[in-house]
């Protein structure tokens, strides 16, 4: 099956309605995908990319119905990943000497996957051109790390088609191939989901590469992607959208996601979300349970947000495993210009919140004060959680908030950037009319040593902790509330007096 693209260019790819996972389990596909391969028939015949290896036989069978395979003069591989070049081995069995145009990095990857160093590779550089007859050329543009080191784009002069590889694509399967034929909301949702989960770490490179391509002053009448729809109606709309997404994108949105052992942390999330809405009804608040909802939906919401709040029950003194996994994904995606905070419930130790706070800080977020609740929050504790949401709403507002609510009065402290900020402790026995205070174990003895109940590290007042700005001869009661155990990275609440 072929679909006519323009003049002597046809789509010869493969639709995949059933696929659900991409990059292992990194990306969940909700709308299937397509593997777009293109056949150009000028004086020379060129095949741009193949399809996923699972469809090799079907791809070659369909191609043989259209042309004599031996008439293919050149193969162009924009990307060596298996969903682009997966059928290459089967194709080369049919036409073994055919030149393959790709980047040097692609040669390394293709040989690594298929183990055929004898193939007729033709390495390219940005600006190289290949004459294909009828006054037309293929112009190559390297695009490393969009999203692999081997990536490149190919431009067809005369027809003004940019074969853009993964850029501007989407995992979206439809019998209709062109962007103006499909549901526009679905299309843009899938474009955003694709960018947020796959291209976000390379946003600076996206901007630089788009500006480089635009500097060539080449007309672009059509963008033929490697996945999903071909952009023929106003194709530059997706280019401008990418530039916006790459520029520290955020909406007036706050995303909360959590995992909970006994629904206690879920209760906190609900109350915090309500508090945010109390103060700023205009902000979009989205709440997700990581154990029950799709992680890529959550990450897309994080991408769209000005700030996130991450909650977890404490289990074995650490956060729940799925929260840890989400934070690892978030760290890899390298979000920028976003705020974050931690919250969670605990029984005898609230280490999860401290660890979440540290991970968010390390991931580049501007971190806010965290919130811990002991055991199941009662009505008073829920009110304090709601007030915490009100506090967050005011602190993170993109414009002045006129709604007046009494919020938690968190004392401002001068805190070194490398040290985690304080955590508010919510105890069900505390009256909601009393301001929350940071819970510490105080000792009136200036020389009293303190023992970390988690790792057994001992704080000695005579020595202090210079790495955290705690001078020698500092009594425990005077140690700053942002202090963390240097061994296990937990807060002051896990310390007890050495008897």
UniProtKB/Swiss-Prot annotation:
Binding annotation for Fe cation 1: 79, 81, 147, 166
Residue stretches making up the Rubredoxin-like domain: 447-498
Cofactor binding, per record: Binds 3 Fe cations per monomer.
GO molecular function annotation: electron transfer activity; FMN binding; iron ion binding; nitric oxide reductase activity
Subcellular locations according to the entry: Cytoplasm
A cellular component annotation (GO) from this entry: cytoplasm
Entry keyword set: Cytoplasm, Electron transport, Flavoprotein, FMN, Iron, Metal-binding, Oxidoreductase, Transport
Region (Zinc metallo-hydrolase): 30-210
Predominant localisation class: cytoplasm
Pfam families: Flavodoxin_1, ODP, Rubredoxin
Positions that bind Fe cation 3: 452, 455, 485, 488
Disulfide bond sites: none
Subunit details: Homotetramer.
Function: Anaerobic nitric oxide reductase; uses NADH to detoxify nitric oxide (NO), protecting several 4Fe-4S NO-sensitive enzymes. Has at least 2 reductase partners, only one of which (NorW, flavorubredoxin reductase) has been identified. NO probably binds to the di-iron center; electrons enter from the NorW at rubredoxin and are transferred sequentially to the FMN center and the di-iron center. Also able to function as an aerobic oxygen reductase.
NCBIfam families found in the cross-reference section: PRK05452.1
PANTHER family per record: ANAEROBIC NITRIC OXIDE REDUCTASE FLAVORUBREDOXIN (PTHR43717:SF1)
Name of the protein described by the UniProt record: Anaerobic nitric oxide reductase flavorubredoxin
Species the sequence originates in: Aliivibrio salmonicida (strain LFI1238) (Vibrio salmonicida (strain LFI1238))
Lineage: Bacteria, Pseudomonadati, Pseudomonadota, Gammaproteobacteria, Vibrionales
Name of the encoding gene: norV
């Amino acid at each position: 099956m072929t679909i006519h693209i323009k003049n002597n260019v046809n789509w010869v790819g493969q639709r995949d309605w059933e696929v659900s996972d991409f990059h292992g389990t990194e990306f969940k596909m909700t709308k299937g995908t397509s593997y777009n391969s293109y056949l150009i028939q000028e004086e020379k015949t060129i095949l741009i990319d193949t399809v996923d290896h699972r469809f090799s036989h079907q791809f070659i069978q369909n191609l043989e119905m259209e042309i004599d395979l031996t008439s293919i003069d050149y193969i162009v591989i924009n990307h060596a990943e298996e969903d682009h070049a997966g059928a290459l081995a089967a194709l080369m069995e049919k036409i073994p000497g055919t030149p393959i145009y790709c980047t040097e990095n692609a040669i390394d990857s293709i040989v690594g996957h298929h183990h055929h160093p004898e193939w007729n590779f033709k390495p390219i550089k940005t600006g190289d051109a290949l004459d294909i007859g009828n006054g037309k050329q293929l112009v190559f543009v390297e695009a490393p790390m969009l999203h692999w080191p081997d990536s490149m784009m190919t431009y067809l002069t005369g027809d003004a088609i940019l074969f853009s590889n993964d850029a501007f694509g989407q995992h979206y399967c439809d019998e209709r191939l062109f962007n103006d034929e499909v549901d526009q909301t679905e299309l843009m949702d899938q474009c955003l989901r694709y960018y947020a989960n796959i291209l976000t770490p390379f946003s600076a490179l996206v901007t630089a590469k788009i500006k480089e391509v635009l500097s060539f002053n080449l007309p672009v009448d059509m963008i033929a992607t490697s996945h999903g729809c071909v952009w023929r109606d106003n194709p530059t709309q997706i280019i401008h959208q990418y530039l916006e997404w790459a520029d520290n994108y955020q909406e007036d949105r706050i995303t909360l996601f959590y995992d909970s052992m006994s629904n206690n942390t879920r209760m906190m999330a609900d109350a915090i979300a309500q508090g945010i809405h109390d103060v700023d009804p205009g902000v979009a608040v989205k709440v997700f349970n990581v154990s029950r909802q799709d992680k890529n939906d959550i990450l897309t919401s994080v991408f769209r947000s000005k700030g996130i709040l991450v909650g977890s029950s404490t289990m074995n003194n650490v956060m729940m495993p799925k929260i840890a996994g989400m934070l690892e994904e978030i760290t890899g995606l390298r979000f920028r210009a976003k705020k974050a905070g931690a919250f969670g419930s605990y029984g005898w130790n609230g280490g999860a919140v401290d660890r979440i706070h540290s991970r968010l800080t390390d991931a580049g977020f501007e971190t806010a004060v965290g919130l811990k609740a002991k055991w199941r929050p009662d009505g008073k504790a829920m009110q304090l959680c709601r007030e915490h949401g009100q506090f967050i709403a005011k602190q993170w507002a993109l414009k002045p908030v006129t709604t007046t609510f009494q919020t938690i009065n968190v004392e401002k402290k001068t805190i070194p950037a490398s040290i985690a900020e304080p955590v508010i402790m919510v105890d069900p026995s505390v009256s909601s009319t009393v301001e929350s205070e940071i819970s510490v174990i105080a000792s009136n003895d200036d020389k009293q040593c303190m023992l970390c109940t988690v790792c057994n590290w001992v704080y000695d007042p005579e020595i202090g902790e210079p790495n955290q700005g705690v001078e020698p001869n500092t009594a425990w009661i005077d140690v700053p509330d942002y202090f963390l155990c240097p061994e296990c990275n937990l807060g002051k609440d896990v310390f007890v007096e050495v008897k």
